[in-house]
Amino acid sequence: LMEMHFQDEPVDFILDCLHYWVTEYHIDGIHLFAGEAALNAAARDALLAKTKLITVFWNGEKKHYKNMANYNAGFMNVARKFLKGDENQLGDFVNVSRYNPVQSANINYITSHDGFTLFDLVSYDRKHNEANGEGNADGENFNNSWNCGTEGPSKKKKIQHLRLRQMKNALMLVLLSQGTPLLLAGDECCNSQAGNNNPYCVDSELSWVSWNSRGMAAEMTAFAKELIAFRKQYKILHMPKQLLSYDSLSCGYPDISCHGSSAWYNTMESYNRHIGMMYYGRD
């Protein structure tokens, strides 16, 4: 995916830029920041019909284009809070995990290029952007991260195991939710940026993706592959429209149901931090 930002440029100029990158560099998709007129024109453009277009739907607006998807930061924020055990998150997580509008695709992610990597999300409580030369003033301050007990790298086995478990949990939140999952390159092999959540100006090992294949990274990569295969295997995990919480598929049970400590009793109290979600359908 190529990320492109436009402000007041004419629509024709924007389309010419998109056409050039698609025809000359054969990119698969575009993360597009532009005005309403340009977004509508790009979604209707014949040359871009098979190009994945991702944007942010502001002010609750809904775009009904099959090739244009919503970059859903709402899922990220809720999933991060739920992952680290914040209170009063169950209801919000159930809502974002089942959200799957039929009119357009919905992109779910827990990390992106604009923020912490997954490894850093479970290794740092705060950003460490000193290398950017701006006195650590740049980058997002509210990351909803948790360092699992120690800030930064740790040789303690208990912390390493907890971080690995949390990273696996994070991948499951993304890949077992409805909608379209998006993974940040390198998250599957524990890539770290040493707590820097905005390394756009750093051209060094800090910002390069490290394709590690040893130890924890090898286990994480194998887990990611198995989880992706599991999602592909079961249609109920990637339905074309939102599940309705009743037997909409005529299978004998609700298509999605929530459970607490006892089956069929979902306890959404603010102090509860666990929930069971059952998908039920046919292949």
Task: Describe each region flagged by the PLM.
Residues P10, I14-W21, R163-V174, Q178, ...:
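Alpha-helical packing segments of well-folded alpha/beta enzyme cores
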Residues L184-C189, Q193:
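Short acidic/histidine-rich active-site segments
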Residues Q193-K225, A229:
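Extended hydrophobic/aromatic segments used for targeting, binding, or gating
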